[in-house]
Amino acid sequence: MTQPSKSNETKNNGTGQPCEVATAMFGYHLLADPILNKGTAFTNDERHEFELHGLLPPTISTLDQQVSRRLEALRGFGTDLERYAFLRDLQDTNETLFHALLARNIEELLPIVYTPTVGAGCQNFSRLFRRPRGLFLSIPHRKRLKDILANPHFEHTEVIVVTDLSLIHI
């Protein structure tokens, strides 16, 4: 397998406006990146260029089609906590699809990603945790905070939420 040179990938930013993103990622690594993964929306040319054939179902779908499928799947869950976990998994795998689904169904989904369900999500964090997302600082690591904050992964942090989780009640 040869690594493609930096190529542009056309992404839909969730509003219907395409934008191009330069990336050297390909194959499974591209699909594992929630920012760059477009799921079944990769075109045949993109699938060839980024070595995705065989890693995705052969059918190419628009963002609208993906949103419809995910909404149908979401509505099939029995509880809001299950729907919350489903949406967190979607956010961890395909942020474009997550944000499009949320934006197009905000009245229905806001109570799931925010109050009241987010409280239950926090209370069940250990059970629902799938992948690291964010920055975790804890008392046992207080002497290493400078080293933790120096991690290059946190260079582009835009939002910080601080909580001790003590006020989350259902």
What does each of the following model-derived ranges do?
Residues F26-Y28, I35-L135, F154:
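Conserved, well-structured core domains of diverse proteins
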Residues R133-K143:
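Short coil-to-helix leader/linker segments, especially the first N-terminal amphipathic alpha-helix
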Residues S138-P140, I160-D164:
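Short beta-strand segments
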Residues R142-P152:
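Short alpha-helical segments and helix-capping/turn motifs at coil-helix boundaries
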Residues H156-E158:
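A general structural motif
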Residues I168-I170:
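Conserved small/polar residues in nucleotide/adenosyl-binding loops
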